[in-house]
Amino acid sequence: MKVLWAALLIALLAGCQGKMEQVVEPELEPEPELHQQADWQSGQPWELALGRFWDYLRWVQTLSEQVQEELLSSQVTQELTALMDETMKELKAYKSELEEQLSPVAEETRARLSKELQAAQARLGADMEDVRSRLAQYRSEVQAMLGQSTDELRARLTSHLRKLRTVSYTHLDVYKRQSLASQPLQERAQAWGERLRTRMEEVGSRTRDRLDEVKEQVEEVRAKLEEQAQQMRLQAEAFQARLKSWFEPLVEDMQRQWAGLVEKVQAAVGASAAPVPSDNH
């Protein structure tokens, strides 16, 4: 039974291939949002990831019979999911990088920008999720309406994708403007950091100069103290020499007088101790 349904589906798709190409070909014409997307592809990694997401969708739409087989399988949904995950990962990384660069900015401003970027990021994610759900819905409708015109289903999907792409690029433009709006804050924060760094360098330079001056003053005071100490030593030595010159004669005279006194005492003692002559001799 499944083989019969598959054969019937292939026959219907083969018969509608000519009409399908007429429906798809206008989609390949340049659109304003596609020009914007081409410009954005030279920007941030998250913009490149989102561009790959829409490039993949446009490639799917350019297929004829093969696209139906792909849509009836889960390959397209899985690949779109992978592209969505890649885009959201790049968005989160870009948001984290912005928050890190805005660290010197006031907490209130940083919180507001973070909230706005998170809201824009959520809208982009919702847009891509809507694309995936509509592809799943289209696949279900193809499976349920094999007896109806597949051209109508293709046209509906093409219209939905065109509208979703327009809305998505509108949200992307909002996200990009909000991210660019934070750049002046980043520049001001960098300028503020540069001024602070310059100010700290000036303060450090003045402090080093002041320390050098204090060091020179300390060296000068130390030299003066050493000079004064030397002068005091010389004065003390001179005073000691004068004292010595004053007292040496007096001491010598006292020593001579003491020596003379000792001699006299010794002579007196010696005379008194001499023996008296005897009458028997």
UniProtKB/Swiss-Prot annotation:
Sequence repeats lie at residues 82-103, 104-125, 126-147, 148-169, 198-219. It comes from the Eukaryota. Heparin binds at residues 164-167, 193-200. The modification Phosphoserine is found at residue 149. Disulfide bonds: none annotated. The modification Methionine sulfoxide is found at residue 145. One of its GO terms (cellular component) is glutamatergic synapse. Keywords: Chylomicron, Endosome, Extracellular matrix, HDL, Heparin-binding, Lipid transport, Lipid-binding, Oxidation, Phosphoprotein, Repeat, Secreted, Signal, Transport, VLDL. APOE exists as multiple glycosylated and sialylated glycoforms within cells and in plasma. The extent of glycosylation and sialylation are tissue and context specific. Glycated in plasma VLDL. Residues 82-219 are annotated as: 5 X 22 AA approximate tandem repeats. GO terms for biological process: AMPA glutamate receptor clustering; amyloid precursor protein metabolic process; artery morphogenesis; cellular response to lipoprotein particle stimulus; cholesterol catabolic process; cholesterol efflux; cholesterol homeostasis; chylomicron remnant clearance. It is found in: Secreted; Secreted, Extracellular space; Secreted, Extracellular space, Extracellular matrix; Extracellular vesicle. One of its GO terms (molecular function) is antioxidant activity. Residues 160-170 are annotated as: LDL and other lipoprotein receptors binding. Residues 1-18 form the signal peptide. Residues 242-254 are annotated as: Specificity for association with VLDL. Its main location: secreted. Residues 230-281 are annotated as: Homooligomerization. APOE is an apolipoprotein, a protein associating with lipid particles, that mainly functions in lipoprotein-mediated lipid transport between organs via the plasma and interstitial fluids. APOE is a core component of plasma lipoproteins and is involved in their production, conversion and clearance. Apolipoproteins are amphipathic molecules that interact both with lipids of the lipoprotein particle core and the aqueous environment of the plasma. Homotetramer. May interact with ABCA1; functionally associated with ABCA1 in the biogenesis of HDLs. May interact with APP/A4 amyloid-beta peptide; the interaction is extremely stable in vitro but its physiological significance is unclear. May interact with MAPT. May interact with MAP2. In the cerebrospinal fluid, interacts with secreted SORL1. Interacts with PMEL; this allows the loading of PMEL luminal fragment on ILVs to induce fibril nucleation. Belongs to the apolipoprotein A1/A4/E family. This is Apolipoprotein E. It comes from Aotus nancymaae. The lineage of its organism: Eukaryota, Metazoa, Chordata, Craniata, Vertebrata.
